[in-house]
């Protein structure tokens, strides 16, 4: 027996397809939209359609953008000799929030994951290597996540880049600011020790 009418059921099903959205959350979202005024619903649907139509990948860094090249690649005040390699566009946003990094980015749009059937050729690695051949780069900062896949991807890229005479570094991993040592796992503590620096 179907509890909801066709349009509501379809809306719930569509929301359920989103990552991290289960059936109950999909129902809450669907009913929230039903209770919104028509203008707000139309604005939401237009924003979704516009984002899908207008967002593309930057031809230089492979980040998402609505202009090509993106604003970061076309910003002459950024240091083009240092490239920070990240997994996805959300990582660029996280790095930018620190206001510490003044170089450029390269977005891989994923990591090597044989278990998920994702090989190096499915990522934006070839574009990175081409970019390094066209641009004078002194350092690549590998800022992939500290997962098995992130580490494997960083090592794979490092092996490709080192013969080009470019310095390859890895962001430090370790204890979060404000975290207690006693609650940290062994891998985190090991990474914190490896990444220690003189004060």
From Swiss-Prot:
InterPro entries: DNA_Rcmb_RecR (IPR000093), Rcmb_RecR (IPR023627), Rcmb_RecR_Znf (IPR015967), TOPRIM_dom (IPR006171), TOPRIM_RecR (IPR034137). SUPFAM superfamilies: Recombination protein RecR (SSF111304). The keyword Amino-acid biosynthesis does not apply. Pfam families: RecR_C, RecR_HhH, RecR_ZnF, Toprim_4. A zinc finger (C4-type) spans 58-73. CDD domains: TOPRIM_recR. Keywords: DNA damage, DNA recombination, DNA repair, Metal-binding, Zinc, Zinc-finger. Residues 81-176 form the Toprim domain. It comes from Clostridioides difficile (strain 630) (Peptoclostridium difficile). It comes from the Bacteria. PROSITE patterns: TOPRIM (PS50880). NCBIfam families: recR. HAMAP family: RecR (MF_00017). GO terms for molecular function: DNA binding; zinc ion binding. May play a role in DNA repair. It seems to be involved in an RecBC-independent recombinational process of DNA repair. It may act with RecF and RecO. Belongs to the RecR family. GO terms for biological process: DNA recombination; DNA repair. Gene3D superfamilies: 3.30.60.80, 3.40.1360.10, 6.10.250.240, RecR Domain 1. This is Recombination protein RecR.
């Amino acid at each position: 027996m179907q509890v909801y009418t066709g349009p509501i059921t379809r809306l719930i099903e569509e929301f359920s397809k989103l990552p991290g959205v289960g059936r109950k959350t999909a129902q809450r979202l669907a009913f929230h939209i039903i209770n919104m005024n028509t203008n707000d619903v139309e604005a939401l649907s237009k924003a979704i359609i516009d984002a899908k139509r207008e967002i593309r990948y930057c031809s230089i860094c492979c980040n998402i953008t609505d202009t090509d090249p993106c604003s970061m690649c076309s910003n002459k005040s950024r240091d083009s000799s240092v490239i920070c390699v990240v997994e996805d566009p959300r990582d660029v946003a996280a790095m930018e929030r620190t206001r510490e990094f003044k170089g450029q980015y390269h977005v891989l749009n994923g990591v090597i994951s044989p278990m998920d059937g994702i090989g190096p050729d499915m990522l934006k690695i070839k574009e990175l290597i081409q970019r390094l051949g066209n641009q004078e780069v002194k350092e690549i900062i590998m800022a992939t996540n500290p997962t098995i896949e992130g580490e494997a991807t960083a090592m794979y890229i490092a092996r490709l880049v080192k013969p080009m005479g470019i310095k390859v570094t890895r962001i430090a991993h370790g204890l979060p600011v404000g975290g207690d040592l006693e609650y940290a796992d062994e891998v985190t503590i090991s990474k914190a020790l490896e990444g220690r620096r003189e004060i």
